[in-house]
Structure formats: structure tokens, C-alpha cells
């Protein structure tokens, strides 16, 4: 079974550890099943967590966009919205191709959720989409 995590973030948020802990829990409590969990790395945002991911045997799928989070404007309302628009245009087609090619059983959506939800409405995937909202 393939489980992919969509959680692109533009600043440090607790959701990153929620994703890592979720994958660790799936691996720990599903010993009878062969479950392959992967995090989709949209714009190199997961590179600063690579050591933690490697330590926990968590694979990443590089979307290979030309975007780099360290070079994108993230502070302020308008600048962050501009970044969200860039992420949309640079990632929507690549995410669609990954879902079509890899055919994950589940796509767990954490952040910037409108991109996979738009794809869900446009295409008939076999993949089940799970929208997970963290916080309060």
C-alpha cells in the first residue's frame, strides 16, 4: 500500500512534525501490512528535515520544481499569497503526473490543500484523498 503526504510549508510550522509522527505511527502500528509512506517535497521545503526523515526511514518524492523556498517571499500577507500562486502553477501538473504514475492508495493532505483538492475535482483518481487539518 502506498501512502503519500502532501504538506508543502512556507514557514516553520508544527505540521511538519505531525506529518513525521503520523508516518512513524503508521509504520509502527501496521506491522502486518506492507505500507510505503512518502512525503512529497514541492519546493525543497523538506530539505532542512532530511536528517530526521532519513533517521526514520521516510522517503521523499521530489517534485523537481524550479522553486526554492529559501528564495521565495514568505513574510507578509501579499508576499505569501504570491508564493502560494507560484506554488500552484509550478506544482499542480507535476502532482497530477505523480498521482497518475505512482497511483498511491492514499494522499494525505496537510497544507496548501487547494492544489490536490482542485485535482480531485478535475480527475477521477483511484487514490483516496484525506484532508487532515492540524491546529486549533
What do these predicted ranges mean?
Residues 46-49, 114-118:
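Short, well-ordered alpha-helical microsegments
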Residues 88-91, 109-115, 133:
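Short His-centered aromatic/hydrophobic patch
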Residues 106-108, 122-136:
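Active-site proximal beta-strand in glycosyltransferases
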Amino acid at each position: 500500500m502506498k501512502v503519500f503526504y502532501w504538506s508543502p510549508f512556507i514557514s516553520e510550522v508544527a505540521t511538519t512534525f505531525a506529518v513525521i509522527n503520523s508516518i512513524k505511527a503508521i509504520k509502527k502500528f501496521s506491522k502486518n501490512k506492507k505500507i510505503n509512506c512518502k512525503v512529497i517535497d514541492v519546493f525543497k521545503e523538506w530539505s532542512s528535515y532530511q536528517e530526521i526523515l532519513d533517521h526514520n526511514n521516510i522517503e521523499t518524492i521530489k517534485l523537481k520544481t524550479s522553486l526554492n523556498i529559501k528564495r521565495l517571499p514568505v513574510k507578509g500577507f501579499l508576499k505569501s499569497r504570491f508564493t502560494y500562486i507560484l506554488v500552484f502553477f509550478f506544482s499542480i501538473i507535476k502532482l497530477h503526473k505523480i498521482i497518475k504514475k505512482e497511483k498511491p492508495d492514499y494522499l494525505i493532505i496537510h497544507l496548501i490543500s487547494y492544489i490536490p483538492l482542485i485535482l480531485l475535482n478535475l480527475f477521477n483518481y483511484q487514490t483516496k484523498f484525506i484532508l487532515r487539518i492540524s491546529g486549533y
